[in-house]
A protein has these predicted regions:
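Non-catalytic structural scaffold of enzyme domains
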Residues: 24-172
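Intrinsically disordered, glycine-rich low-complexity segments
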Residues: 13-14, 25
Length: 172
């Protein structure tokens, strides 16, 4: 009887312990930290997506997560536009270190705008922070490069080759 699949996040990728050589059960059960609240709905949506894309057959097979919902985080767009980001970065540092002290193996930040400060935030902690925009590009390119993706469909990789990618953006 094969073990039930267990997925964990690492650099934005999910791994199945049945099919991933070198992944131990301990590694599969690493804790994911989330710096959220910058868009409470974005945090809620991210949490929902992690749960939906975890191959779990019971509650105990889900990823342990610490969600730090910091709705009072200083405005990211204002920090970008004015260059006044000391308070924002101090708060991000506090959050990253809190998640590190709680034993999180990886940190996700569902707020895309926060990734403008990714390098500074990453410098505050030894815990790898998942760079969501880069992972989105990796996801899109996987379909374009692979032709037909050979990735696990449970990871929601593109089923068809990607021929065009649209980009929308703002000043912050």
């Amino acid at each position: 009887m094969s073990a039930a699949p267990v997925r964990f996040a690492s650099g934005g990728r999910g791994y199945d312990t049945r099919n991933c050589v070198g992944v131990t059960k301990e590694a599969a059960m690493e804790k994911l930290g989330v710096i959220g609240g910058m868009g409470a709905e974005a945090t809620s949506y991210y949490y929902d997506q992690v749960v939906r894309h975890t191959a779990a057959t019971c509650d105990q097979e889900h990823i342990d997560m610490v969600v730090l919902s910091k709705s009072t985080m200083p405005d990211r767009t204002l920090a970008i536009k004015t260059g006044e980001h000391a308070e924002l970065l101090a708060t991000m540092k506090e959050c990253a270190r809190a998640l590190e002290s709680l034993g999180c193996a990886h940190i996700a930040i569902p707020c895309n705008t926060s990734h403008y400060f990714y390098d500074q935030i990453q410098s505050f902690t030894k815990v790898p922070i998942i760079h969501m925009p880069r992972e989105s590009v990796r996801y899109a390119l996987a379909g374009a490069v692979m032709g037909e993706c050979e990735f696990d469909p449970n990871l929601s990789m593109p089923a068809e080759p990607v021929h065009k990618i649209g980009i929308m953006g703002t000043d912050g």
